[in-house]
Amino acid sequence: MENYQLVLASTSPFRQQLLEKLAIPFSTLSPNCDETPLEGESPQQLVLRLAESKAQSCQINQPSLVIGSDQVCVINGNIVGKPHNRQNAIAQLTAQSGQSIVFYTGLAVYNSETGETRSCIDEFKVHFRPLTQAQIVRYVDKEQPFYCAGSFKSEGLGIALFEKLEGKDPNTLVGLPLIDLIDLLAQQGMQVLG
């Protein structure tokens, strides 16, 4: 598959940084899809549908493998989105203090030549330390995680919020499960290590 171009259907700088770890040249495109949850759709169904939709929405003129990814954070059965501002971030972290939350990340690789899409879901659990309001405010003011699901950056100071992490790939928390991606690329004929 040397003639296949790798494309990341995302403008997220976090996902781009993760994909760079694989040392494969890639380009990025902004996906064009409606991210509104469907009525009755589970978190798992939502992230899988959106990952596939993002990958398939990119119009490519050459043979490419297009990567789509989507992530939601679930606490007490409710999907928690990005906070977008300081007040919401503080409220989210206050609700998560001493709790366990689950991240579901949908991942899809679309082959623009064959039309085939391979996809999977990765689950990652985060157990928060009991946090004081002062700790939460200090963290939010220092790291400003306004565009991160769950209101934290696990790759930064956010690690101080956690008691325990459970999952097969810590990259999942940042939004791109690389272990699963390596497998999906291999299923499409692209070997990361050659």
Curated annotation (Swiss-Prot):
Function: Nucleoside triphosphate pyrophosphatase that hydrolyzes 7-methyl-GTP (m(7)GTP). May have a dual role in cell division arrest and in preventing the incorporation of modified nucleotides into cellular nucleic acids.
Catalytic activity, EC: 3.6.1.-
Site description Important for substrate specificity, residues in chain: F14, Q71, E155
Entry-linked Pfam families: Maf
Domain of life the protein comes from: Bacteria
Active site: residue positions: D70 (proton acceptor)
Species assigned in the record: Vibrio vulnificus (strain CMCP6)
Alphabetic keyword roster: Cytoplasm, Hydrolase, Nucleotide metabolism
Location in or out of the cell: Cytoplasm
Cofactor(s) of this protein: a divalent metal cation
GO terms under cellular component: cytoplasm
Family in the record: Belongs to the Maf family. YceF subfamily.
UniProt main location, coarse: cytoplasm
Gene3D superfamilies: 3.90.950.10
Record-level GO BP terms: nucleotide metabolic process
Gene Ontology terms, MF aspect: nucleoside triphosphate diphosphatase activity
Swiss-Prot/TrEMBL catalytic activity: N(7)-methyl-GTP + H2O = N(7)-methyl-GMP + diphosphate + H(+)
InterPro entries: ITPase-like_fam, Maf-like
Annotated protein name in UniProt: 7-methyl-GTP pyrophosphatase
